[in-house]
Amino acid sequence: MKIVVPGGNGFIGSHICRLAVNAGHEVVAFGRSGEPDLLPVRHPWVGKVTWRTADVFDVDAWSDALDGADAVIHTIGTITQDPDNGVTFDRINGEAAMVAAEAAADAGVDAFVKLSVQSKPPGVSGRFLASMRRAEREIPARLPSLRTVFVQPNLVFGDDRFGTPTMAGVLQSIGRLVPFEYGSYHGRPLPVQLVAATAVQAATTATLRGALGVDQIDGIGRTSGLVEIDDLPEPTLRPLLAGIGSAALTYWTLKRLRRTSA
């Protein structure tokens, strides 16, 4: 099958591309920065992907990639806004997906898979989730020819992103003490490999459609045959967190814990 991946050079997108080409699919990926900064010697799959430099809103720059394509896996999204530079929840999480879906439908593509989220992340505006859900309602309603699937994990972690497994561990640990969606079993963090495998399965399996939450992603990813289950990373509580985002999220969870305990 031929799969087109908008945002394929990102964290989850690159894992999707890797699993898809290793499974024998033809993959074309594009993003504003083009090919990911990965050494082909260490990541031989990179050379099997056709990389394009394009903005999703400039359809003329990438629509030819849809020729003969069977599926689109849309991985573009944001949890922060920068309105001065055109980065808003509605534009990036909603309009970008609609643009890609319309182009896919016009090209006769069968399936449109969109990465989304099951619940609102801690400390993030409710407009983030609202923009996701709006796109998930409008795409199947306006483009019924597409088989649409929305892959909805919560926190996604992987060994190749330092600090992310730590944050997953913090949320999982806090969730045992103070119940909230991201720390519960049904809202648990998932390894990026399972999310990527589910996205590939969603693109290539005609019976999959609609929203796939954390439990379904876990099950589909583990039975996909695309990942080595024994090699999956586990979220851990490490002493050092990386990045301002992780520190801010940790501060938020600890404040929540103190308020609940008071």
Give residue spans per PLM region.
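Conserved Rossmann-fold NAD(P)-dependent oxidoreductase catalytic core, especially the SDR/UDP-sugar
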Residues: 26, 33-34, 78, 83-137, ...
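NAD(P)H-binding glycine-rich loop region in Rossmannoid oxidoreductase-like domains
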Residues: 39, 43-99, 103-106
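Substrate-positioning beta->alpha
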Residues: 92, 96-97, 163, 183-202
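Flexible, glycine-rich beta-alpha linker
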Residues: 149-170, 176-178
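Alpha-helical substrate-binding/gating segment
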Residues: 175, 189-229
